[in-house]
Every structure is written in C-alpha cells, then in structure tokens.
C-alpha cells in the first residue's frame, strides 16, 4: 500500500518498465488496437498524462474527477464516463491496467472477433478465498453468462472473471443498461 498511496499501481516499474508498458507492448503486437484510453481518478491523472508524453502510440487520459475511495465511480461507471466524454462508438477492449500477464491478450481478441460477439475472459477458480476477491460468473451450455457476482461471499459458481472484456460496437451503447 505505501507504494501506491501517492503513485498509480499501473505505472509501478516491473522488470525495468511500468506495468502499463508491458500491457501496451502486448496489445501493440496484436495489430488490433487503434488507441488507448486510460481512466484515472483525479489524484493520479497527472502521473498518467506524464507517462503518455513518451509514447509513440495514441493514449488519451480521462480524469473521472474523483479523489477518494468514497467518491470513486467504480469500473463500469468509469467506462460509461469515458464512453460519454469521448463519444466512443467503436469496439472496446477493456482491461485493468494493473495486471502483469503471463500470456498475450491477442488470442482473446481474436476469439472475440471470430465469434462476432462481446466476450469476457474467465477461468476456473476453486479457492474460496480467491473467489471472494474477484468477479464470479455462471454460464449456460451456450457459454452465455447467466449470473455475475462481484466479490461474492457465497459464490454460485467457480468461473472467475479477470478484468478483460471485449465489447462489440453495438454493446458499448448498452453499458448504461448494465448500470440500471
């Protein structure tokens, strides 16, 4: 916690470069990404803006205006805020920028494009303590999500959802519905 009290976790160096650089390099290698949007609270927005200055790819930083845990919007409302503020009307890949991955997101993006549908990544997680710290879904025989729980005390299933989502263009416009 002391490391991230006054500095954003996605910009912490790992192996000589910020976590976000590892993610961006992977995404750049896929050939699918046109630009990046970083959504930040007001406290850390300046750090992200400074980080973007040295980037060869297009990055837009959106300051959501919040400054405390009590006033933060939450992930879905942050996405909605950025979509409205930037008038985004294209496919979106949404990822949490504080994850260091041992795999490429390219396969996930290709899968979503081949299926022609919005997708969430999921994996089996059988440890209850870990299930209680993440999102858990259940799905039907067609892989359609039938329930979604954020950090459940009594999970209905064992499919953990890391923060990696591909949204089709037509589903981006429906983010408002998910909030209501």
Regions found by a protein language model. Name each.
Residues 1-3:
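A phosphate-binding catalytic loop at a beta-strand-loop-alpha-helix junction
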Residues 5, 12-13, 17-96, 105-107:
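Conserved N-terminal catalytic core of the sugar/cofactor nucleotidyltransferase
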Residues 6-9, 132:
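Residue-level signal for pocket-adjacent positions within structured domains
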Residues 7, 18, 66-68, 126-127, ...:
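Residue-level detector of flexible, active-site-proximal loop/helix-junction positions
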Residues 43, 99, 126:
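Short, glycine/serine-rich, charged loops/turns that create anion-binding
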Residues 76, 179-180:
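Short intrinsically disordered coil segments
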Residues 96-97, 180:
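Short acidic donor-binding/metal-coordinating loop in glycosyltransferase active sites
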Residues 102-179:
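Conserved core of the sugar-phosphate nucleotidyltransferase
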